Amino acid sequence: MEFTPIDPHQHQNAATLLCCNCGTPIDGSTGLVMCYDCIKLTVDITQGIPREANISFCRNCERFLQPPGQWIRAELESRELLAICLRRLKGLTKVRLVDASFIWTEPHSRRIRIKLTVQGEAMTNTIIQQTFEVEYIVIAMQCPDCARSYTTNTWRATVQIRQKVPHKRTFLFLEQLILKHNAHVDTISISEAKDGLDFFYAQKNHAVKMIDFLNAVVPIKHKKSEELISQDTHTGASTYKFSYSVEIVPICKDDLVVLPKKLAKSMGNISQFVLCSKISNTVQFMDPTTLQTADLSPSVYWRAPFNALADVTQLVEFIVLDVDSTGISRGNRVLADITVARTSDLGVNDQVYYVRSHLGGICHAGDSVMGYFIANSNYNSDLFDGLNIDYVPDVVLVKKLYQRKSKKSRHWKLKRMAKEHKDIDASLDYNSRAQKQEMERAEKDYELFLQELEEDAELRQSVNLYKNREANVPPEEHEMDEDEDEDAPQINIDELLDELDEMTLEDGVENTPVESQQ
């Protein structure tokens, strides 16, 4: 008898059995009693995942709640909102999330629908994939920050900005910088005080963030103080209110300044008799007779502070009689010898003054200029008294004076910052002469700031200008007025931004200008 040897590598057919549900033959070695299709039809791996959920939304600040207590700003159908919705679903950790997407709903329906695709193990070694929808009901409520904003004394930190000058141009400029960089988004409220502004915050780090911003844009020094509000004797936990006192260097653009002799030598041996030409995080001075410039950091200034000798309120109008250029220039400044006469002296006397000035590039015979009349002024300053009078000019020219329309309708405008309205005090007469003078002074400062923006292209780069749709005449159709100079500076329409509805700052709140400069 012959035996046929068994080849161990010979293919053997696997045992099969019938699906208990549909009778389809399946591999019996897997240990399953149902086929894959029947498993998908009968097994629900999404069991335990709710099909409806709630999500909290603050109507005031338009933020969504991310438990336990974080409020996040998220647009509809954004990745941030999708993450918040997924975190609200219980049981999602038992399956593997493959895909998630929004299903469009009407924005006013207060419903958010999401389509989810998940994978999970249905039976032994069997992975199935299923898709389902979840609907979220948006519940409107009020977040703690907004709730505190409607009550008094809710702030935890305040930034008090002050500048001891007789005008508000610095704060007009600072206001535009804050709006451009959205540095006011964390502010609870803003109130106007004498010589400055007060910003209130719910958290200390928001105030520190504002201090860092101010350090980057204007020359300041600040001082921190704190006040104990409450203390838990059992845990030792304490609650404080923090105050940051910020003082801006009291020197503004176009101010006439006498530098201390030692400081002038340390700044490149610049002349002591200078003009302030620019304000940023440092103070820039310029010698109008040589065009030399030098920067002064706020830390150096506060070691030995000094005040300006004269400001723009003391400018006098002069008429240009002759301009003789020296051929020396630096940037857009041209050094020239200019002959001027005081406007009020015309027809009275023949007194003329010979001035070396940086305005040689824009001045011509017959133009009007503004300058400081040193020869006819009496200054109460020890620094000025220490100067050699032989080297002090009779006149220092500052800028060219352009004749403008008395009621000029500009084709551009600026955003303004909403201000917290203070309670009306019945004891104050808001129609008094003092109040009217204060309003007129504020309007004059704002008009001077607008003119400064028109004349200084470099200054315009740091602010946002918007198209004024309410202007009476489009800029292309402007006809020169008899009272306006032909070379009066104009802002090109290409420099203007379109004002979008969502960029509006006055959402149901009456806007009042907050004075702000340069």
Curated annotation (Swiss-Prot):
Keywords: Cytoplasm, Nucleus, Protein transport, Transport. Residues 478-488 have a biased composition (Acidic residues). This is 60S ribosomal export protein NMD3. A motif (Nuclear localization signal) lies at residues 399-415. Associates with the 60S ribosomal subunit. InterPro entries: Nmd3, Nmd3_N, NMD3_OB, NMD_SH3. GO terms for biological process: protein transport; ribosomal large subunit export from nucleus. Present with 11900 molecules/cell in log phase SD medium. Acts as an adapter for the XPO1/CRM1-mediated export of the 60S ribosomal subunit. Unlikely to play a significant role in nonsense-mediated mRNA decay (NMD). A motif (Nuclear export signal) lies at residues 493-502. The gene is NMD3. Its main location: cytoplasm. GO terms for molecular function: large ribosomal subunit rRNA binding; protein-macromolecule adaptor activity; ribosomal large subunit binding. It comes from the Eukaryota. One of its GO terms (cellular component) is cytoplasm. It is found in: Cytoplasm; Nucleus, Nucleoplasm. It comes from Saccharomyces cerevisiae (strain ATCC 204508 / S288c). Belongs to the NMD3 family. Residues 466-491 are annotated as: Disordered.
